[in-house]
Structure formats: structure tokens, C-alpha cells
């Protein structure tokens, strides 16, 4: 169901984009490459060119891409132009204790547009893709019932994939068991927990890296709860939750050199504008088991600085390196896993600014 319908939002979006910076693989007759004429770009929003077109379907826009690619700015402008509301689809931006290190949208944005599922959950609360999907689905339906356009912004591939294509319904894990497994992990660490998992569920152990704490704990919990491998549930038919909606996916894909530059600049800004104090407060108020598993880049490095294991410059440099590596993995994932999408490309800040300057004005 990844297709255009008869609304004009993507047509208007593409209409203002410069010739060189966009291509789409959502056209009936092949891709629009760099240098394509504006006339051919207009076809992206033409319902005659789209598959599975249905005027009865409501639209959802998903704006995805690597960290520091400009998603928040573009999404905000899109929401202002098309009477939209924004929903978070980033697994780390749900936590209320870490808005700075996760680069959550600024308060100034939230005075102009309604934002949902940002910074609402405590780190001590259990959260999963299933819980996210339930909340996101509720928000999407609320927004469309108000006659507005839901715009989801983020870079968490698992959430996006599950929302668009469906999910494997793994039984809920009891809170008592979750607490037991987390306490066990704190006591014995990753390597020994992985060894235990290998005895119970060799299939999961063969697919999960010992250093991937979150997946390791999750797989152990699932086996303890169900007696089955977490991967056995992936062979079951996926449950579709928004089959009556039409997804339109826009992928921001900056040129790599520029992306790495924006990653470095963002981390530098975040470190200077409160991230150190933010993580210091977490370290003071919470037990290590509540924050050591968080995957937001920068937390691990700042903790190393606070513990005296790195200088501030070393922590920043390490965080920048890890952010660039993460961004590269995100780009690869979106290129390979999401086929029907519109891709926006730009090589520097000037191109990005010019490309998106008043892109949604109806002419």
C-alpha cells in the first residue's frame, strides 16, 4: 500500500525541490534520477502515476533518515504547510529525562504544532515496539479524525517497519520477570547472560551479538516467559494495524561527507548546551540498571567522562565517531529495507536550505 493517492501534498512538496537533489522510486515507469526535469518530478504527486490509488484511504507521511539529516526541520515545515501534527517514531526520544542528548524537538516548535509521543516516558518504565505501535496507532487515528495529517518523524527502523508492514505479536513479558532478568543482567553482565541464553535458545544466541544488551535481554525474557525462541515468532504471519491507511515515506539522504559534518556539529552543540548536566542528573537520581542500556549516542561517552575515564574532549570525539557510524548504518538500512519511498538528496547546507526554502507554498 505504499502509494500516492489523490491529495496534493507530495506534489507540492516536490514542486519546489531543485532539479539535482531528488529522485523517487515510487513512479510507475522507473526512477527519477539527479538532473531530471521538473516536469518529470511533478509526476510524483500525480495520482495517474501511482499504484494502489484509492481516494478512500487516509494518508500518513513518514519522514525518516539518519540522525542529524534535518528531519525535524523538514517535518515541522511540512506540518505547518499541510495542517499536520507530528508523531515521534524514534525509540530514544520517548524518554523524558534525556531531551537534550536525543536532540528532541525544541519547545519553540511545540508552540506552533502539536507534537506527540516525545519525552513522555520515564526510563524506569518498560517500553517495547508493541507498546509504541499501540500508542502511535491511537494518535494517528485521533489526528485523522480531527481532519489533520499525521506526520511521523524519526530514524528507528524497527518501529517504522512494524508500523508500515506489520509486526510479530510476541506475548507480553510480566513486570516481575522483566525485573528479575534486568537484575540478573546487572549482576552477571552481557557475556554470562549470553552464555545462559545460548543454553536455552541457541538460535537466538547465534543471531544476537554479546554486546547488544537490549536484544540480549529481550530474547532472554521471551524465552523465560514463553519457552520459545524470540525468532520462532518471526515465522508467524505479521499483524497489520493500519491497513486502511496509505503510507508515504520520505527519506532524507544527505551526501555522506555533509552528513558526517552535521553529526559532528550536532554532538558539539549538544555537549555545550546541557547534555553533560542532563546525564549527570540521571547518574545521580537513577540506578545504573535504569540508564546503562539506553542506546542514545553520547550517554555512554558522557558517563565515561563523569566517571573520570575520559577527558571531555575524548568523550566528545568518541561520541562523534559512534554517531557517524550509527548514521551510516541508518542510511544503509533505509536504502535496503524501504523500497517504496521518495528520497531527498543534498550535498551541503546551502543546498538543503535552498531546497527546502518555502517548499510547501501553494503556487
Curated annotation (Swiss-Prot):
The alphabetized UniProt keywords are: ATP-binding, Magnesium, Nucleotide-binding, Transferase, tRNA processing
What are the start and end residues of every segment in region (Interaction with substrate tRNA)?
90-93, 214-218
Keyword field contains Magnesium: yes
GO MF annotation, one: tRNA dimethylallyltransferase activity
Q: One short Pfam family name for this protein?
A: IPPT
Instruction: List every stretch annotated Unknown insert.
Output: 1-55
Name the catalysed reactions.
adenosine(37) in tRNA + dimethylallyl diphosphate = N(6)-dimethylallyladenosine(37) in tRNA + diphosphate
Q: Which residues bind substrate?
A: 67-72
Q: Provide the residue positions that the database annotates as binding ATP.
A: 65-72
Q: Which GO terms describe its biological process?
A: tRNA modification
Q: Site described as Interaction with substrate tRNA, positions?
A: 156
What cofactor does this protein call for?
Mg(2+)
Give the EC number(s) under which this enzyme is classified.
2.5.1.75
Q: How does it assemble?
A: Monomer.
Give the protein's biological function. Answer: Catalyzes the transfer of a dimethylallyl group onto the adenine at position 37 in tRNAs that read codons beginning with uridine, leading to the formation of N6-(dimethylallyl)adenosine (i(6)A).
Q: HAMAP family of this UniProt entry?
A: IPP_trans
Q: Which NCBIfam families match?
A: miaA
What family is this protein classified in?
Belongs to the IPP transferase family.
- Protein name in UniProt: tRNA dimethylallyltransferase
**What lineage does UniProt assign to this protein's organism?**
Bacteria, Pseudomonadati, Pseudomonadota, Alphaproteobacteria, Rickettsiales
Amino acid at each position: 500500500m505504499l502509494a500516492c493517492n489523490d491529495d496534493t501534498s507530495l506534489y507540492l512538496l516536490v514542486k519546489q525541490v531543485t532539479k539535482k537533489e531528488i529522485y523517487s522510486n515510487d513512479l510507475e515507469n522507473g526512477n527519477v534520477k539527479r538532473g531530471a526535469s521538473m516536469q518529470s518530478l511533478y509526476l510524483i504527486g500525480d495520482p495517474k502515476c501511482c499504484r494502489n490509488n484509492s481516494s478512500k484511504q487516509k494518508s500518513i507521511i513518514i519522514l525518516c533518515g539518519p540522525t542529524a539529516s534535518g528531519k525535524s526541520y523538514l517535518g515541522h515545515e511540512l506540518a505547518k504547510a499541510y495542517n499536520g501534527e507530528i508523531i515521534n517514531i524514534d525509540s530514544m526520544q520517548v524518554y523524558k529525562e534525556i531531551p537534550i542528548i536525543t536532540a528532541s524537538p525544541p519547545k519553540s516548535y511545540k508552540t506552533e504544532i502539536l507534537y506527540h509521543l516525545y519525552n513522555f516516558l520515564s526510563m524506569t518504565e518498560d517500553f517495547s515496539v508493541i507498546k509504541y505501535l499501540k500508542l502511535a496507532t491511537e494518535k494517528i487515528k485521533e489526528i485523522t479524525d480531527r481532519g489533520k495529517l499525521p506526520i511521523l518523524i524519526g530514524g528507528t527502523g524497527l518501529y517504522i517497519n512494524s508500523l508500515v508492514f506489520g509486526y510479530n505479536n510476541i506475548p507480553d513479558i510480566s513486570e516481575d520477570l522483566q525485573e528479575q532478568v534486568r537484575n540478573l543482567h546487572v549482576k552477571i553482565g552481557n557475556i554470562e547472560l549470553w552464555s545462559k541464553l545460548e543454553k536455552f535458545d541457541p538460535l537466538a544466541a547465534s543471531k544476537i551479538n554479546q554486546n547488544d544488551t537490549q536484544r540480549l535481554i529481550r530474547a532472554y525474557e521471551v524465552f523465560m516467559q514463553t519457552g520459545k525462541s524470540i525468532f520462532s515468532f518471526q515465522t508467524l504471519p505479521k499483524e497489520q494495524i493500519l491497513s486502511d491507511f496509505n503510507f508515504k515515506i520520505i527519506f532524507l539522504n544527505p551526501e555522506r561527507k555533509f552528513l558526517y559534518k552535521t553529526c559532528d556539529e550536532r554532538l558539539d552543540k549538544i555537549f555545550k548546551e546541557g547534555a553533560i548536566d542532563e546525564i549527570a542528573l540521571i547518574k545521580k537520581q537513577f540506578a545504573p540498571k535504569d540508564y546503562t542500556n539506553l542506546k542514545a549516542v553520547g550517554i555512554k561517552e558522557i558517563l565515561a567522562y563523569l566517571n573520570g575515564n575520559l577527558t571531555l574532549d575524548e568523550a566528545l570525539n568518541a561520541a562523534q565517531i559512534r554517531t557517524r557510524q550509527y548514521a551510516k548504518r541508518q542510511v544503509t538500512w533505509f536504502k535496503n529495507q524501504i523500497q517504496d519511498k521518495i528520497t531527498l538528496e543534498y550535498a551541503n547546507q546551502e543546498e538543503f536550505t535552498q531546497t527546502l526554502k518555502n517548499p510547501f507554498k501553494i503556487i
